[in-house]
Amino acid sequence: MEDWTQAIQNALEYVEEHLAGELEICEISRRAFLSPFYFQRIFSTLCGLGVGEYIRYRRLTLAAQELCSTDAKVIDVAAKYGYN
């Protein structure tokens, strides 16, 4: 199980570093050295969320934090995190 968690951790680090950009499951799964299909199954089992769900949740969380802590316009923050 430790190997799987490290593989998922590597992928999560990549996702966190690229949240403001475009993320593709092929590239994310490559970071875990797994096929996209198998990666999604393991990710869902270990994290309790699908990959797309996790990415949406993290982007919304970061956008909410930015809106609360800055004077940025909603439209600008939305565009920054891919909600256009």
Name what the model sees in each region.
Residues 9-26, 45-81:
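Terminal helix-turn-helix DNA-binding modules in bacterial transcription factors
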